Amino acid sequence: MRDVWTMSAAAQAEAVRRGDVSAVELVDGHLERIAEVNPRVNAVTQLMAEQARAAAARIDRLRANGTAPGPLAGVPFTVKETTPVEGVPTTFGVPRFRDLVAQADAPPVARLRAAGAVPIGHANVPTLVLAGMHTRSELFGDTVNPWDPGRTPGGSSGGDAVAVATGMAALGLGNDSGGSVRIPAQFCGVAGLKPSTGRFPADHRVLGPDDPGPASQMLVTDGPLARSVGDLRLAYEVLAGTDPRDPRALPVPLYGQPLPGPVKVAVVADPGGQGVHPAVGAAVAAAADALRDAGYDVREVADVPRMAEALDAYGRITVTEFAPSWPVVRTLLGPGGDRYIARAMERTPPASAGELVRLMGTWLGIRRSWAQFLDEYPLLLGPVFTEPPVEPGLESRDGAGRDRVAAGMRLCTVTSFVGVPAVAVPTGLADGLPCGVQLVGRAFREDLCLDAAQAVEDRLGVLTPVDPRG
């Protein structure tokens, strides 16, 4: 079977289960694609060729013995450089961590592996996932957007998005605390899921025995990237569940009760009223039309709840938590790599103890306001990033660039802050670059987001896999 890397994850797994292709052949096909494409885009940082072939051979033996090999049998996936894979360094893109070998798989890696999927490589990130939105690490260099090398692939899960978009992997495992799955998905023309806080188990004790602070515990969620919504759904069904390493993860059903009547969708093309690029506005309009055609009750809404207040609280809480570690982190980021965070630290001073207590109360109140909004409108349609893909490093260039990027990702930031699920889905091309939208839902109603994203995809199409251009 030729060019197995062009197949969907669902088709790849089905081909392995039927015996049309072996898992080893599937992995080898992706390794050949990586050898062909990765030198041009620099997305895969650590290739796990021998480990992947060994895992694939075990899957083939299971099938030969009559044992079901799993819903993702043989499907290759990449893993963000921040997420442990047993026996492989977890570098965060930092030379100092090049020998930090993981002793066990992170919970989401373990769940994908248990479903038959095969980790094939780590994928690039911004240094320490803190050097900015562009995927450039001190250890591995720049990752290139396959649609246009003059535009960023986004971040911080940019390596996974590029790997999936170019067919080097069928799935990518990233994480998102303010757009880090969804923005690369838009910029690279793939689909991405940020789940509800507590939907997927995780363990972010990577650099030592201590857990992160409360903001990191609440904001960071692991999430998959895929070329189609159907593949995203497969990954969602596998990743959801509980794990004793993560007391936040809840045993909530994958699918909620059907809603009566047509599902209402609130459309907010310009959240916060700060402006939106015409191409992105057109993408939101196209997705709204697709949902109307699919029978959704689509309504224009003035704005989302408490946008400015949420952005301010997000910034102050995260800076306050981060401030004690800033001197050490600044050294790890190195000259130039610290500019993005340094500007944030200068602009937003840490809160006092009393201020932090009040901010935590504000956080709960904002979450309540969003729960009430989504009780009336079970889905929200809006932009992922309010511009097409921007130039690499814009956010680190100067204060104006940082402000522009912060404004562009504002809906991602706020939806991470309130812990609700969102699916990014492509809508087409504008001037040769991918456009997309996100569908945001009630807490633990990822199924509603996926259903609506599928309706958009069915009417507007899939953009990838793509060969690198330029």
Predicted segments — roles?
Residues 30, 52, 232, 265, ...:
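Residue-level signal for inorganic ion chemistry
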Residues 52-54, 62-137:
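Acidic/His- and Gly-rich active-site-bordering loop/insert found
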Residues 79, 119-122, 173-175, 300, ...:
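General beta-strand structural signal in soluble alpha/beta enzymes
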Residues 104-236, 416-429, 433-438:
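Short glycine/serine-rich loop segments
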Residues 1-54, 293-295, 465-470:
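An N-terminal boundary/leader segment
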Residues 194-282, 460-469:
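A short helix-breaking turn/cap at a secondary-structure junction
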